[in-house]
Amino acid sequence: ELKKTGLYENAIIWSPSKADLSDLSISHCLSYIKKIKYGLLSYKEERRLGLSWSKRLSERSFLAVNGTLLTANLAIKSGVGCHLGGGTHHSHFDYGAGFCVFNDLAYSALMLTKNKIVKKILIFDCDVHQGDGTARILEKNDNIFTCSIHCKKNFPVNKAQSNLDVELDDHTNNIEYLHEIQKSIKFCVNSFKPDFVFYDAGIDIHKHDELGKLN
C-alpha cells in the first residue's frame, strides 16, 4: 500500500536489530521476557495477549521494540521518523495484552532517558484505546509524560491513570476530536515542556473502523 501512494519511494528504510533481554528488562520483568523468547506462555497468558506464541511472533516482538528505539534516535538527528510496527501500548510490565507483546513506547522512552539522549519525553497516544500498559509502566517516572486520548467506552474495561487522560464519547466527530487534540497537545507542551515526543497515531479512530466507535 505504501508503494502505491509513493511514500515508500521517498523514504529511507532502516532495519533494527533485536532487543537484548537485559535492555528489555528496563520496561518488562525478565521472567515475562523469557516466556516470549522461549515460548513458555500458558494458555491463559496467550488468551490475554490475544495471540498464540510462535517463533516468528517472538522474533518480530524483539525486533519491533528496537524498531521504535531506532526510529527515535533517527528522529533526534533528522527531526522526524516513522515506525509502522510500533504503538503496542497494552503491554504491561509482566504480561502482554490486546495483541501487544512488548511495550515499545515505554521501552524506547526509558532507554532514551537512561542513556541521557533526551531528558523529558511526551508520549502522545491517539489510539482509540487507552494506553493502559504505557501508563502503568511509567506511572512513577517524572521525566516521561503520558497522554492518552481515547474512546471512553472501549477497551480496556479497567483503565489506568495516565498523566493526562482525555475520554471521548461514542460518535465523536472531526471537529470535536481535533479540538481535543489541539487543546491536549497545547497543555502537554506548555506544562511539561518535552524535549522529544512519541506520537502513537492509531488509525482505529477512523469512522470505518468497526470497533472504534468514533466518527
Question: Where in the sequence are the language-model features?
Answer:
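N-terminal low-complexity, Ser/Thr- and acidic-residue-enriched intrinsically disordered segments
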Residues: 1-21
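Residue-level detector of short coil/turn "hinge" positions at structural boundaries
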Residues: 9-10, 31, 119-120
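Short, conserved beta-strand segments within well-ordered enzyme catalytic domains
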Residues: 14, 25, 83
